Design a protein with these regions (language model features):
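A glycine-rich dinucleotide-binding beta-alpha-beta segment and adjacent secondary-structure elements
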Residues: 173-185, 382-446
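Helical element adjacent to the flavin cofactor pocket in flavoenzyme catalytic cores
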Residues: 198-243
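Rossmann-like flavin
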Residues: 96-192
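Active-site-proximal substrate-binding core of FAD-dependent oxidoreductases
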Residues: 466-473
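Mid-domain catalytic core of redox enzymes
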Residues: 240-344
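C-terminal segments that line or cap access tunnels to active or ligand-binding sites in enzymes
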Residues: 296-399
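A conserved FAD-binding loop/helix module that cradles the flavin
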Residues: 54, 442-465
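N-terminal glycine-rich phosphate/pyrophosphate-binding loop and immediately adjacent elements
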Residues: 2-128
Length: 473
């Protein structure tokens, strides 16, 4: 039995703890905050609850694969402890771009339907391949057929932008709608693999889901699995330094044989070296996330997930790269009617504004935030600014997200050149020069949301168990 310390009780940390404890190892999770889930945090306003962080779940087969893996490793049964149900939304989202409005998947009556159908048919067949890559190491031989299928579609067009530009049959505005999804990795389509185009089609064909009760239910389910398997989870424990075989905290030290880090690489390095966490020159986007309880309902035609796009995406990406406020940005509006997802008695809304990772604190009247709120209100057809409908609200800024590690509040940390994608990604799950350290989380598997986080955990944990094995009974 190996003694393992897991740093961070976000989704990847909890998932790692559950699998490793289920395999028979002694696992302790250390979390500096007093809640489970990391960025996925449960808050309460005016007696109503909402969950921060990622709001939607795609590729449900990854969650099922995680549960199947958990069951295969030990005696605890996932069905007895996970207790997690999902509800599928009617559409992936409604997109607003200049004078265009469309749902994904595009409806038959829309003038983009023919182009969308062609695109969708070309990429639907890649959905199993994407799922395989989400849960497989890039050098895993079993992933080669999936990579081969993608190579046939993309050819030498490696980036999302180069591939989308090559689709002569597709209207320019629809190309922009598909390309905007690269912000799920925090960067522009010029800096992401063409895979992101296919992920849009896969999401549209499979649909997207929300856990009943909110996304934080995933963190709670993972914690129940971890505890059932024998892991210990300690909240409110701040790590002060990391040594060769122990972790120092404000409350004492924890020895380990192996260390699993879900922390941002900059934070991990600072704890290892004692040097300050520096602001990366190239980093992913951040956000100004506004969570509110509404005085009254939004119009009946407002869907659960709306995407308000900028008129000029290139200007947005340029501003984000320079870490300055954009003229217009991409904003998600997640609207939950009373009793729909959360057990609330009032409607709630999350207005999630893509922001530069500048580490700053903004409010509703910061000029660019104010402009964006007014633009969102106009696009949704509201008679007043959306914040005039707030009964109570809370704003989470880049300075808040910086507390989770990435300097400046970059949601996915520092970005890397395109050639460092896949097998060359840095940081890696495991570096032979640091044999006791393993990494999980968004920094080693950026983009792809919750499935990528869970998939990355499966990849890292499988490799770890191959190395250290399961304790003999």
């Amino acid at each position: 039995m190996a003694k393992i310390v897991v740093l961070g009780a976000g989704l990847s940390g909890l998932a790692s703890a559950a699998l490793l404890a289920q395999a028979g190892h002694e696992v302790t999770v250390l979390e500096k905050n007093n809640w489970l889930g990391g960025k996925s945090r449960r808050i309460e306003l005016a007696g109503q609850r909402m969950d921060t962080g990622p709001a939607l779940v795609t590729f449900p087969e990854v969650w099922q694969q995680f549960l199947d893996t958990f069951d295969s490793l030990g005696t605890a049964r996932s069905k007895e402890h996970a207790d997690l149900n999902f509800t599928k939304l009617k559409e992936v989202g409604r997109y607003y771009l200049r004078n265009h409005v469309t749902d994904l998947p595009v409806k038959p009556e829309h003038h983009w339907y023919k182009a969308w159908q062609q695109f969708s048919e070309e990429h639907d067949a890649l959905t199993p391949a994407i799922s395989k890559l989400l849960t497989s190491h890039p050098l895993d031989p079993s992933a080669l057929p999936a990579l081969g299928k993608m190579a046939k579609v993309y050819g030498l067009r490696l980036t999302t932008s180069s591939y989308i530009r090559s689709l002569a049959y597709m209207p320019q505005a629809l190309k922009e709608v598909i390309s905007i999804h690269t912000l799920n990795a925090g960067v522009s389509p010029n800096r992401t693999l063409a895979l992101y185009a296919s992920m849009t089609a896969a999401m549209a064909s499979q649909g997207i889901s929300v856990p009943v009760g909110g996304v934080n239910e995933i963190a709670l389910a993972l914690s129940r699995l971890a505890v059932a398997a024998g892991a210990k989870i300690e909240l409110g424990v701040s790590v002060t330094s990391i040594g060769h075989r122990s972790v120092a905290t404000e409350n004492g030290s924890y020895g380990f044989y192996h260390l699993v880090s879900s922390l941002d690489p900059g934070v991990l390095k600072a704890l290892q070296t004692g040097k300050p966490n520096r602001l990366a020159k190239h980093r992913s986007c951040s956000g100004v996330a506004i969570y509110a309880v509404l005085k009254e309902s939004l119009p009946s035609d407002v869907v659960t997930h709306s995407v308000i796009m900028p008129d000029d995406a290139d200007q947005l990406h340029s501003s984000l790269d320079k870490a300055v406020p954009p003229e217009q940005t991409m904003t998600f509006v997640n609207y939950y009617r009373a009793g729909e997802i959360y057990p609330n008695t009032k409607d709630t809304v999350a207005v999630l504004i893509t922001a530069p990772a500048d580490g700053k604190k903004h409010d509703l009247n910061s000029e660019w935030v104010r402009n964006e709120l007014d633009r969102v209100s106009q696009k949704l057809g509201l008679k007043v600014a959306i914040d005039e409908l707030f009964e109570a609200y809370e704003v989470l800024n880049p300075d808040y997200f910086a507390q989770f590690g990435a300097a400046g509040g970059a949601l996915y940390g520092a970005t890397t050149p395109l050639w460092q994608s896949g097998p060359f990604h840095n940081p890696q799950y495991h570096n032979p020069l640091r044999p006791r350290l393993w990494r999980v989380g968004a920094s080693v598997h950026p983009g792809g949301g919750i499935p990528a986080v869970l998939g990355g955990t499966l990849i890292a944990t499988r490799a770890m168990l191959r190395k250290i094995g399961k304790p003999k009974k």
